[in-house]
Swiss-Prot record:
Signal peptide segment: none
Subunit structure: Homomultimerizes to form the nucleocapsid. May bind host exportin-1/XPO1. Binds to viral genomic RNA. Protein-RNA contacts are mediated by a combination of electrostatic interactions between positively charged residues and the phosphate backbone and planar interactions between aromatic side chains and bases.
The species this protein was found in: Influenza A virus (strain A/Wilson-Smith/1933 H1N1) (Influenza A virus (strain A/WS/1933 H1N1))
SUPFAM superfamilies according to UniProt: flu NP-like (SSF161003)
Post-translational modification: Late in virus-infected cells, may be cleaved from a 56-kDa protein to a 53-kDa protein by a cellular caspase. This cleavage might be a marker for the onset of apoptosis in infected cells or have a specific function in virus host interaction.
Gene this chain is encoded by: NP
Keywords from the UniProt entry: Capsid protein, Helical capsid protein, Host nucleus, Host-virus interaction, Ribonucleoprotein, RNA-binding, Viral nucleoprotein, Viral penetration into host nucleus, Virion, Virus entry into host cell
Any one cellular-component term (Gene Ontology): viral nucleocapsid
Name of this chain's protein: Nucleoprotein
Any Pfam family hit: Flu_NP
UniProt GO MF annotations: RNA binding; structural molecule activity
Motif position, Bipartite nuclear localization signal: 198-216
UniProt-listed InterPro entries: Flu_NP
Function: Encapsidates the negative strand viral RNA, protecting it from nucleases. The encapsidated genomic RNA is termed the ribonucleoprotein (RNP) and serves as template for transcription and replication. The RNP needs to be localized in the host nucleus to start an infectious cycle, but is too large to diffuse through the nuclear pore complex. NP comprises at least 2 nuclear localization signals that are responsible for the active RNP import into the nucleus through cellular importin alpha/beta pathway.
């Protein structure tokens, strides 16, 4: 870990703040949430949505996407310079669903980006409020993480699909800032770096000239983000090697794959935040709740509290199970796609099942789907307990490895043994220990071999009753470690396609 003095809390990253005390952080995060809520209320008014329609998660996603697109400067510039047929670069829109004569109807809306920007700024006291935009990006990213597997993307970059637990935040745009970087998994960073290295191998000019200099700066910055996620000296030294390489190529590619695999046991620090859809914040603001005055945290009890008192609806396709749709959204809300299902089940108070057993597709409805047969139902997003979200991935006991499972990345700071399939993981480490990183590789393998599942990943942390807002009396659950705890285990989830 970097020294405590240099680490900013998520909330500071979230609000681009200087060092702030806890109260100031809670206030600035609250301000951000309040801004999203006010924007959402205004959009619902503009679109003349009923209360029920405004609480429909599909409408929320469209409205969130419109404002993100309105502020996507690079893409807007690109669209203006490369006009494509039938696409107005100055407009943004999407499907809005309305209840008409007892049926759901889809209406495609189109707005001037300028108008959306005006409404957003007005809701945020005239500021661009980038933190609020990033917050919505992270919510979309968490929803993607819970909905799709990235098998194809993993295989394309030469990684093993079983490493999916390292892929948190893989659909986050690069422009998501420090808050976005904090929630990206080790695999996501490795994948971004490998893509750069591959381009460099195929395109002689990639690292050259003025553009190449900028590319190089981006490459080193990504390496530094990755380095900050590792908790052992050997892993970090290896990232330094990758960063310092004059001409990144196959050796760096190999090192990165090795590092990604090592993270299955020597887990990296990846932030988790509960980012909720705008249709949760809007009604709360409308009911008179003042987020800035009351303060808010993305990693404490607040999101759980908010969800206890929220009504959110979703469109349901004919053969989908509403309870399963609820589980998908619950996991997305708490950034729990890669958490051990036993931990999630305990906190939620109902059994959380693996992705392959869910009878539900994603939340978004494609434009060619038949609306005639669409129903809607309430999403059950409440929980039995709450727990603090983690940013650490577990203790590495005195630089000894803490143990992972071939696919979990803890979301909640809850004491548990982490079962992991050492033979499967270690099988990936036979062979290649020569080359300039051989001593680091040897050390990393030694650390992994000495990792024991008994090394609990969070000493003494537990879950809390929803009435216990100060986290005073932890309840340490005991888990049945005999069965499989990963969400994408033996799975057939859909692939994510941009």
């Amino acid at each position: 870990m970097a020294t405590k003095g240099t680490k900013r809390s998520y909330e500071q990253m979230e609000t681009d703040g200087e060092r702030q005390n806890a109260t100031e952080i809670r206030a600035s995060v609250g301000k951000m949430i309040g801004g999203i809520g006010r924007f959402y209320i205004q959009m619902c008014t503009e679109l003349k949505l009923s209360d029920y329609e405004g609480r429909l998660i599909q409408n929320s996603l469209t409205i969130e996407r419109m404002v993100l697109s309105a502020f996507d400067e690079r893409r807007n510039k690109y669209l203006e310079e490369h006009p494509s047929a039938g696409k107005d670069p100055k407009k943004t829109g999407g499907p809005i669903y309305r209840r008409v004569d007892g049926k759901w109807m889809r209406e495609l809306i189109l707005y001037d980006k300028e108008e959306i920007r005006r409404i957003w700024r007005q809701a945020n006291n005239g500021d661009d409020a980038t933190a609020g935009l990033t917050h919505m990006m992270i919510w979309h990213s968490n929803l993607n993480d819970a909905t799709y597997q990235r098998t194809r993307a993993l295989v394309r970059t030469g990684m093993d699909p079983r490493m999916c637990s390292l892929m948190q935040g893989s659909t986050l745009p690069r422009r998501s800032g420090a808050a976005g970087a904090a929630v990206k998994g080790v695999g996501t960073m490795v994948m971004e770096l490998i893509r750069m290295i591959k381009r460099g191998i195929n395109d002689r000019n990639f690292w050259r000239g003025e553009n190449g200099r900028r590319t190089r700066i981006a490459y080193e910055r990504m390496c530094n983000i990755l380095k900050g996620k590792f908790q052992t000296a050997a892993q970090r030294a290896m990232v330094d090697q990758v960063r310092e390489s004059r001409n990144p190529g196959n050796a760096e590619f190999e090192d990165l794959i090795f590092l990604a695999r090592s993270a299955l046991i020597l887990r990296g620090s990846v932030a988790h935040k509960s980012c909720l859809p705008a249709c949760v914040y809007g009604p709360a603001v409308a009911s008179g709740y003042d987020f800035e005055r009351e303060g808010y945290s993305l990693v404490g009890i607040d999101p759980f509290r908010l969800l206890q008192n929220s009504q959110v609806y979703s469109l349901i396709r004919p053969n989908e199970n509403p309870a399963h749709k609820s589980q998908l959204v619950w996991m997305a809300c708490h950034s729990a796609a890669f958490e051990d299902l036993r931990v999630s089940s305990f906190i939620r108070g109902t059994k959380v099942v693996p992705r392959g057993k869910l009878s539900t597709r994603g939340v978004q409805i494609a434009s060619n789907e038949n609306m005639e047969t669409m129903e809607s139902s309430t999403l059950e997003l409440r929980s039995r307990y709450w727990a603090i979200r983690t940013r650490s991935g577990g203790n590495t006991n005195q630089q000894r490895a803490s143990s992972g499972q071939i696919s979990i990345q803890p979301t909640f700071s809850v004491q548990r043994n982490l079962p992991f399939d050492r033979p499967t993981i270690m099988a990936a480490f036979t062979g290649n220990t020569e080359g300039r990183t051989s001593d680091m590789r040897t050390e990393i393998i030694r650390l992994m071999e000495s990792a024991r599942p008994e090394d609990v990943s969070f000493q003494g942390r537990g879950v809390f009753e929803l009435s216990d807002e100060k986290a005073a009396s932890p309840i340490v659950p005991s888990f049945d470690m005999s069965n499989e705890g990963s969400y994408f285990f033996g799975d057939n989830a859909e692939e994510y396609d941009n």
